Amino acid sequence: MEKFGVHNPATELATVGLGGAASVRYNFSAAALYEEAIRRGEAELTAQGALRALTGQHTGRSPRDKFVVRDANTDGQIWWDNNKPLSPEHFALLRDDMLAHAAGKDLFAQDLVGGAEEGHALPTRVITELAWHSLFIRNLLIRPEAAALPTFVPKLTIIDLPSFKADPARHGCRSETVIACDLTNGLVLIGGTSYAGEMKKSVFTVLNYLLPAKGVMPMHCSANVGPDGDAAVFFGLSGTGKTTLSADPARTLIGDDEHGWSENGIFNFEGGCYAKTIRLSAEAEPEIYATTQRFGTVLENVVLNERREPDFDDGSLTENTRCAYPMHFIPNASETGRAGHPKTIIMLTADAFGVMPPIARLTPDQAMYHFLSGYTAKVAGTEKGVVEPEATFSTCFGAPFMPRHPAEYGNLLKELISRHGVECWLVNTGWTGGAYGTGKRMPIKATRGLLAAALSGKLGQLQFRTDTNFGFAVPVSVDGVDGSILDPRSTWADKAAYDAQAEKLVSMFIANFAKFEDHVDGGVRDAAPGVKAAAE
């Protein structure tokens, strides 16, 4: 086997059974990986210097093809209602077949780290058959100092071979695509998909398994910190504004997607960002847009025009177009990826039913209730006309990546909130004045104004009312914000229609939470919403 690049000779690919590969390129730089990807026809250079790659059939994650090995260690620790089991025997067959498939191939390996806090970091080796995948994961995870590479010892190994096709009958999986996680032995196998996000989320899944046992809370969130060291965490599902609202020129960005909360404070799991680019503009999101115009950034499934310039308005390949870049491409990003304990937690929702207020203060019990609920609402495409919004509940604001039972994460979060006296707010970036189709989107200016007041501590000192549907505290008036939007019912022309819509959403919350009731204490159960008669 030919070997190129700096690495630890004691942990070469042969140690994981890949000794039959034709060559391996360890820890290649962005420039070298550009050359390899372009030479192999995997990707092309854009006019501005980014690297554009297409993923073919899979333009998003394949959650139905993700499996966790069920063994003596994991059997009692994994939430099997949400995670698909794979037997150790099937995993061993899959591993052996993937290793055999890799024989004679040219491979790439990156030695990286998941987790910016040393005591909780996960040294990770990612082995890929595609050069652009090697650049992608190099951008996304934390890159160790060059001096550390000759002694680097991985605790997690990911092998990603898109050209390998799994056999459901032989490997115990669902299709030719497979993401199989052996949490006990620290090995993840990815086959049959070129979508690069699978690698990133595999590291997240493993950290979500390992950290709670150490008393560390893993979170699917963005985070930033103010000039006085006041950190804030933003939970939220896709499309609720996590990335947009945490990108604040007055605050330092810690990270946009995955963090841990330890005894020392919060820390980023990653060293880069994986931002959506559909309809991205220099006006609306200048910092993210700027990363797409430079060398080193990977553009995934972005359409290029005849001049090789990205067309971010073109969703013909997928709406899930992305860019992957290292954190230092953002001007006000943290150099350490760490901050103290959060002063504020924001839970974002985009309520398309038009029922929730733009902001509400949560008690620790209410915070745990809404964290376990993980509510937002999806809206249908306008080309099909106006249809009912669809409620989405993704527990912990990230169910696909949570191997343990949600109550484990929820109880840990509640304990940390109480211990550190964190102020919690629910922020609704959805609809006001009616449901989706009749109402309008919550003005971003109002959301930013309310958020700034919450982060500064001023909002907590104002007068509040108790919401009759959800029981949380809502400010009565806030300087610089139109007072009418603070009371959603008053923005509806038809008050009876509002009451009916509120009752409908409350009943959805209650039905969804039934599965958690046996796993939480009375305080959290009592934080459930309940419709009370509203005064006209």
Curated annotation (Swiss-Prot):
Main localization of the protein described in the UniProt heading: cytoplasm
Top class in the EC scheme: lyase
Keywords: ATP-binding, Cytoplasm, Decarboxylase, Gluconeogenesis, Lyase, Manganese, Metal-binding, Nucleotide-binding
InterPro entries: PEP_carboxykinase_ATP, PEP_carboxykinase_C, PEP_carboxykinase_N, PEPCK_ATP_CS
CC cofactor note: Binds 1 Mn(2+) ion per subunit.
Subcellular location: Cytoplasm
UniProt GO BP: gluconeogenesis
Binding annotation for ATP: K201, H220, G236, L237, S238, G239, T240, G241, K242, T243, T244, E285, R322, T447
Catalytic activity: oxaloacetate + ATP = phosphoenolpyruvate + ADP + CO2
Residues annotated for substrate binding in this entry: R61, Y195, K201, R322
Any single Pfam family the record assigns to this protein: PEPCK_ATP
Disulphide linkage map: none
Needed cofactors: Mn(2+)
Enzyme Commission code: 4.1.1.49
Glycosyltransferase in keyword set: no
UniProt KW Metal-binding keyword: yes
Gene3D superfamilies associated with the record: 3.90.228.20, Phosphoenolpyruvate Carboxykinase, domain 1, Phosphoenolpyruvate Carboxykinase, domain 2
GO cellular component: cytosol
UniProt-annotated binding residues for Mn(2+): K201, H220, D257
Lineage top rank: taxon: Bacteria
Xref: HAMAP family: PEPCK_ATP
Family affiliation: Belongs to the phosphoenolpyruvate carboxykinase (ATP) family.
NCBIfam families per UniProt: pckA, PRK09344.1-2, PRK09344.1-3, PRK09344.1-4
Function noted in UniProt: Involved in the gluconeogenesis. Catalyzes the conversion of oxaloacetate (OAA) to phosphoenolpyruvate (PEP) through direct phosphoryl transfer between the nucleoside triphosphate and OAA.
Protein name (database record): Phosphoenolpyruvate carboxykinase (ATP)
